[in-house]
Design a protein with these regions (language model features):
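Extended active-site and interfacial segments that coordinate phosphate-rich ligands
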Residues: 1-29, 82-131
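Conserved catalytic core of nucleic-acid polymerases
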Residues: 2-45, 368-376, 382
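Flexible, active-site-adjacent loop/turn segments at secondary-structure boundaries
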Residues: 14, 19, 33, 43, ...
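A long amphipathic alpha-helix within ATP-dependent nucleotide-binding catalytic cores
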Residues: 33-73
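Contiguous hydrophobic, helix-prone segments at protein termini
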Residues: 43, 47, 62-68, 76, ...
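Generic beta-strand/beta-sheet core signal
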Residues: 73-75, 82-87, 469
Length: 501
């Protein structure tokens, strides 16, 4: 590999690989032969030839006005250009002069908590509606709840300056700089002594009995909207409302997540302390508990059992690549019942996400992992997720009994108390996370309907570009559509932002 600077025509680097096989001409065409030992580390081209090749490449690139892939040959010291074609898979050039400055000078920002679920650069609409507006709104809602619960007027913004989260070069960060001046000390003491204990007692029931049912009810309301007849403004209002509600849900669920994490860590620390080198961890005592993941696998295994009842369907599922399985089932005379089962599965579990940004597809939008799991379940009909869960639970109880017997009278009640807390709160963590992003199928349905309308009006290139404009820009595009006018400038802006992301 030789790298030449096309401007200065200088060799920047050279890496000579060991060559073991060479292609030679024969009477029948070509054949591969071993490279003689003395030639295996020879350079293919010298510096002068490499520079000459770079000069030819620069001229061809200038002629066509775009990067090109060039094939060449050398015979008797003369370079012959055989072919030149555009490079279609060239990644974008690195951005220049990129700075990673905090949103506010002198503050610390980290990728933790909620932003850990945002692994990639954010889409502009998610950045606006969720990261900036939604999370700050949910902080204010939490402040009101804490004040009403404790009777103490609390202003969380006194401890940290808004916003709670912001993006830097497209990546999400949350604030990690807090105000702990002497003037806030009395309020901080009251929060820790009076408010925090009440919050721990009340926030878990609030998440389970109020926030989660309320969140799901709002999702159901927006799922029922008449897409075809809803005005553009209503579609955008639904996107904004669902984004805000999911942010509210995150903070409501935070106490369940926190309690599960803390009780697990404390139990793990205690077990490691008293296990006398047995390498036990808290996870051994939390196996076989109620689990949404197990529930999902049980439902998928039920679909597999239905397929197993038909030799034709079973062979179809086993022989068809997962990427083409839905099409194959739709075309099969017995496939509709399986399609219905899969749709029911996705209605329950399809909102699950790998990236909290609602521009990213949900499991229902990109169900390849489900189809791969279904093929595995059909190929292994003896597997039973519920039976395995029961077996793990039985092993867990035997381990608990053995551990209790091994502890002394002082350690035993401590272990029981810590185990009870961890087993109580551990299932809440999975359930709380299960509903994060639950609004996204409904939100994406609204957004893509709006995107389809704006695409037909000439203000977007494709419906999914709706995620690359902010709400004010979408409102402007809708207003132009109502007037029979297109906004190609917004289509260009969305296209540029998508490329940047």
């Amino acid at each position: 590999t030789v790298i030449v600077d096309k401007t200065s025509q200088r060799i920047l680097s050279r890496e000579t690989a060991t060559k073991t096989i060479m292609t030679v001409r024969t009477d029948e065409g070509t054949a591969g032969q071993p490279v003689p030992q003395t030639q295996r580390n020879h350079q293919v081209v010298d510096d002068a030839t490499a520079i000459e090749l770079a000069r030819h490449g620069t001229q061809i690139e200038a002629l066509y006005g775009l990067p090109v892939d060039i094939e060449w040959a050398i015979s008797d010291g003369k370079i012959a250009i055989l072919q030149a074609r555009p490079i279609t898979s060239l990644p974008p050039a690195p951005l220049k002069d990129v700075r990673w400055d905090p949103p506010r000078p002198g503050t610390v920002w980290m990728r933790r908590q909620i932003v850990e679920h945002m692994p990639e650069p954010l889409s502009p609409l998610f950045d606006e509606l969720y990261l900036r507006h939604g999370l700050d709104h949910s902080m204010e809602t939490l402040t009101v709840f804490m004040s009403d619960l404790s009777g103490v007027k609390i202003d969380l913004w006194a401890f940290l300056d808004p916003p709670f989260a912001a993006s830097v070069n497209g990546y999400a960060y949350s604030i990690a700089s807090f105000n702990f001046g002497l003037s806030l000390l009395p309020l901080a003491l009251r929060v820790y002594t009076l408010v925090l204990p009440k919050m721990i007692r009340h926030l878990l029931p609030r998440w389970r009995d109020e926030s989660l049912p309320g969140y799901r009810a709002i999702i159901a309301d927006w799922k029922g909207i008449d897409l075809a007849n809803a005005p553009d403004e209503e579609l955008l209002r639904g996107v904004r409302a669902l984004a805000t509600e999911d942010a509210n849900y995150w903070f409501a669920a935070a106490v369940a997540l926190g309690l599960a994490r803390i009780t697990d860590a404390v139990l793990n620390r205690f077990v490691r302390l008293v296990s006398n080198g047995s390498h036990l961890t808290s996870g051994s005592f939390l196996r076989g508990l109620p689990s949404k993941a197990v529930d999902a696998q049980v439902q998928l295994e039920a679909v597999a059992r239905r397929i197993d009842g038909s030799d034709a369907l079973r062979q179809l599922v086993l022989d068809t690549p997962a990427s083409r399985l839905l099409t194959a089932l739709a075309e099969h005379p017995e496939g509709q019942v399986v399609m219905d089962d899969l749709q029911q599965y996705l209605d329950t579990y399809g909102h699950q996400i790998y990236n909290l940004d609602f521009a990213a597809p949900t499991l229902a939008d990109a169900p390849l992992p489900v189809l791969l799991s279904l093929k595995t379940a059909v190929a292994n009909p003896e597997r039973d997720a519920r039976a395995r869960q029961a077996r793990l639970a039985q092993e867990r109880e035997l381990l608990v009994a053995r551990t209790e017997q091994s502890l002394n009278p002082i350690q035993r009640p401590i272990f029981k108390r810590l185990l009870g807390w961890a087993q109580r709160y551990s299932p809440y963590r999975e359930e709380a996370l299960f509903y994060v992003g639950a609004a996204w199928p409904a939100l994406r349905r609204l957004a893509q309907e709006l995107g389809q309308r704006l695409t037909q009006a000439g203000s977007l290139d494709v419906p999914d570009d709706v995620f690359y404009l902010e709400s004010a820009e979408l409102a402007a595009a809708s207003m132009a559509r109502a007037e029979g006018v297109s906004r190609p400038d917004l289509a260009k802006l969305a296209r540029e932002r998508r490329t940047l992301r």
